[in-house]
Amino acid sequence: MSERDSGSSGPVKAKAAAPRAKTSGQAPFGAFVRKPVEKTEGKAKANAANAGSGATEMRMETAESWPVDAVEVGAIVDAYGLKGWVKVAAHADAGHGGDALLSAKRWWLLKGQERKSAPSLQAKTHSDSVVAHLGGVTDRDVALALRGSRVYISRSEFPALGADEFYWVDLLGLDVVNVAGVSLGKVADMIDNGAHSVLRIEYPATDKSGKPVTGERLIPFVGVFVKTVDQAAKQITVDWEADY
């Protein structure tokens, strides 16, 4: 994820795992806009108390029952312990935008063509990953069978952000224009360079022989360059010349 500093020269304050722009019939795979939050390691998220008795088990899903706003946020890489917990490699650091994994009430799992969903009974950070206990996963063997599953969360379950904070997935596809109104292309991807987020913009161009090609621009997502993000208008305005 990334947080754009609204100051004239402020950097993006938080970092994000590099995303891959990829679709699977759902919203684009996205890393998150990262927001510094209180570390949640050792703090369990208990959603079971709010769930009905019939909602605590894993269930099979279809393409039709899959949420239209599902966003891939990680992958199950291993079992954790002996009691059915799973270990997840999150696409954004746990505690820094991987928070959706901690707060979401239901996880949606895709492995090959098989779709499942399960309530998140408990989830917490553990070192550089997230560990969770999902409904219906009663022992280590069941947890091991979930290895390789890609984890999706409904976009509607992402934690709310403050002013001037954006989830990467919400920036993908937006038109980019400069302050003079010149179109610079569309956001194709977001990159984390370690210091701040970077917009990767694609636009139609031609090579030296006149053949159509896709051009690329990289614009740091910081306040000195990014002036406005209008999600309703699907447009980002930047202080950036077309010939840079």
From Swiss-Prot:
Q: Where does the record place Basic and acidic residues bias?
A: 35-44
Q: Where is this region: Disordered?
A: 1-58
Chain ranges of the PRC barrel domain: 163-244
- What this chain does, per the record? An accessory protein needed during the final step in the assembly of 30S ribosomal subunit, possibly for assembly of the head region. Essential for efficient processing of 16S rRNA. May be needed both before and after RbfA during the maturation of 16S rRNA. It has affinity for free ribosomal 30S subunits but not for 70S ribosomes.
Which organism's genome codes for this protein? Paraburkholderia xenovorans (strain LB400)
Q: Which family does it belong to?
A: Belongs to the RimM family.
Q: Which GO terms describe its molecular function?
A: ribosome binding
Q: What name does the UniProt record give this protein?
A: Ribosome maturation factor RimM
Compartment annotation: Cytoplasm
